[in-house]
C-alpha cells in the first residue's frame, strides 16, 4: 500500500516520489542507478527520523489519526493467536465500533477488547468511525466479567475520537454505560493491561482504559477533548487547534511525565503506519513485560493496587511560599 503523507511530511513525500521515479527508470534502463536510489533512501530515512524527533503535539495528533495506522484487529493479527471474536451485549445489539473476544498471548489464554475504526467508507460507517454506542461499552463489560469468571487477563486497545453523542445513544444510557464500565474495571479481579494505540478521546476512551498497567504508543494521544473541540470552546475557532494541543498536554511523553500512564511504547521511525509488524512487535514486548509485573498478584492485591493508583491521580503537594 502506498504511504499517505501528512501535510508536515511533504519534504519526505517529495523525496519518496523521487525515489519511486528512479526505481521506475531503473526497471526500464540499462543504466545502473541503484547507488543513487540507496543514497536517497538513506537520506529519506534520516529526514524522517529528524522530523519525527521534533513533532509538535498537534502534529502528533495528526499521526495518531493517520488513516493507515494499525487498528486493534491489526495488532490482534500480529500479536495474538487463536482469536475468536465474541459479539453483542446480550441486552440490545452488537456494536462494531468495539471488537473483543478470546485469544492466546504467548500461549496464555486471555480476553481482548478494543475500539475498531474502518479503512474504507463502507467499513467506517459500519464501525461508526470508531465511536462506540452504549451497547459497545456493555459488550466490553460483558467480556470483562467473562474474563473474571475464568481468571483470564484482559488486554484493551484504545483508539477512538470519543463515545458516540447521538440521540439514540443518549436515550440508551451512554453516560451510564461508561460509568458502569469504570466501576467494573476498578474492581475487576484479573490483570488489566490497557494501551492507547491511536486517539484516546475523553470518556469514550477511558471506558476501556482503567488498568493495572496503562501504556501509550509513542505517537498516540489521550485527552478530555479533541484539540479542535477545545479550541472551539476557548477561542471560538477550530483554527487554534495546534495551540490547544500544546496547552492540553495530550502526548504520550507529556502524560508519562505527569504519571498518568506507566509506559510509552516506541514506534518505528515515521510512525506505526509505516511498519505495522515492527510496531506490533514493539507492543508485544511491552505487553509481555506489563503482564509479567501483575500476573503473580492475587485478586485482592490487584484490586488494592489498582485503587491506590486511581486514587493517586491528581495528587499534589503544597509548598509554603
Curated annotation (Swiss-Prot):
Q: Which GO terms describe its molecular function?
A: acetyl-CoA carboxylase activity; ATP binding; carboxyl- or carbamoyltransferase activity
Where would you find this protein in the cell? Cytoplasm
BP terms from Gene Ontology: fatty acid biosynthetic process; malonyl-CoA biosynthetic process
Q: Which SUPFAM superfamilies match?
A: ClpP/crotonase
**Mind listing the UniProt keywords for this protein, alphabetically?**
ATP-binding, Cytoplasm, Fatty acid biosynthesis, Fatty acid metabolism, Lipid biosynthesis, Lipid metabolism, Nucleotide-binding, Transferase
Catalytically driven reaction(s): N(6)-carboxybiotinyl-L-lysyl-[protein] + acetyl-CoA = N(6)-biotinyl-L-lysyl-[protein] + malonyl-CoA
EC code:
2.1.3.15
List the pathway annotation.
Lipid metabolism; malonyl-CoA biosynthesis; malonyl-CoA from acetyl-CoA: step 1/1
Q: What is its main location?
A: cytoplasm
Query: What Pfam families does UniProt report for this protein, alphabetically?
Result: ACCA
Query: Taking every annotated instance into account, which residue ranges of this chain make up the domain CoA carboxyltransferase C-terminal?
Result: 39-293
Membership in a protein family? Belongs to the AccA family.
Q: How does it assemble?
A: Acetyl-CoA carboxylase is a heterohexamer composed of biotin carboxyl carrier protein (AccB), biotin carboxylase (AccC) and two subunits each of ACCase subunit alpha (AccA) and ACCase subunit beta (AccD).
What does this gene product do?
Component of the acetyl coenzyme A carboxylase (ACC) complex. First, biotin carboxylase catalyzes the carboxylation of biotin on its carrier protein (BCCP) and then the CO(2) group is transferred by the carboxyltransferase to acetyl-CoA to form malonyl-CoA.
Report the protein name in the record.
Acetyl-coenzyme A carboxylase carboxyl transferase subunit alpha
- The organism named in the record is Azoarcus sp. (strain BH72)
Amino acid at each position: 500500500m502506498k504511504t499517505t503523507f501528512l501535510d508536515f511530511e511533504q519534504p519526505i513525500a517529495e523525496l519518496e516520489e523521487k525515489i519511486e521515479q528512479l526505481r521506475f527508470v531503473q526497471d526500464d534502463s540499462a543504466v545502473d542507478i541503484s547507488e543513487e536510489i540507496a543514497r536517497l533512501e538513506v537520506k529519506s530515512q534520516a529526514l524522517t527520523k529528524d522530523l519525527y524527533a521534533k513533532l509538535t503535539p498537534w502534529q502528533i495528533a495528526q499521526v495518531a489519526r493517520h488513516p493507515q495506522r494499525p487498528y486493534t484487529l491489526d495488532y490482534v493479527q500480529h500479536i495474538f493467536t487463536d482469536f475468536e471474536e465474541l459479539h453483542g451485549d446480550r441486552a440490545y445489539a452488537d456494536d462494531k465500533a468495539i471488537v473483543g473476544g478470546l485469544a492466546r498471548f504467548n500461549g496464555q489464554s486471555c480476553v481482548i477488547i478494543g475500539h475498531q475504526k474502518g479503512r474504507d467508507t463502507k467499513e467506517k460507517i459500519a464501525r461508526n468511525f470508531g465511536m462506540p454506542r452504549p451497547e459497545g461499552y456493555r459488550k466490553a463489560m460483558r467480556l470483562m466479567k467473562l474474563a473474571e469468571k475464568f481468571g483470564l487477563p484482559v488486554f484493551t486497545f484504545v483508539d477512538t475520537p470519543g463515545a458516540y453523542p447521538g440521540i439514540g445513544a443518549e436515550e440508551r444510557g451512554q453516560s451510564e454505560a461508561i460509568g458502569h464500565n469504570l466501576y467494573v474495571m476498578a474492581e475487576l479481579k484479573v490483570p488489566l493491561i490497557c494501551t492507547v494505540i491511536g486517539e484516546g478521546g475523553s470518556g469514550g476512551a477511558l471506558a476501556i482504559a482503567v488498568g493495572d498497567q496503562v501504556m501509550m504508543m509513542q505517537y498516540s494521544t489521550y485527552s478530555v477533548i479533541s484539540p479542535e473541540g477545545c479550541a472551539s470552546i476557548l477561542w471560538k475557532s477550530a483554527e487554534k487547534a495546534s495551540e490547544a494541543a500544546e496547552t492540553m498536554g495530550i502526548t504520550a511523553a507529556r502524560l508519562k511525565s505527569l504519571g498518568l500512564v506507566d509506559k510509552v511504547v516506541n514506534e518505528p521511525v515515521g510512525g506505526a503506519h509505516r511498519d505495522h509488524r515492527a510496531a506490533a512487535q514493539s507492543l508485544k514486548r511491552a505487553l509481555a513485560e506489563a503482564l509479567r509485573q501483575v500476573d503473580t498478584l492475587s485478586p485482592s492485591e490487584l484490586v488494592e493496587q489498582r485503587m491506590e493508583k486511581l486514587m493517586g491521580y491528581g495528587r499534589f503537594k503544597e509548598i509554603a511560599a
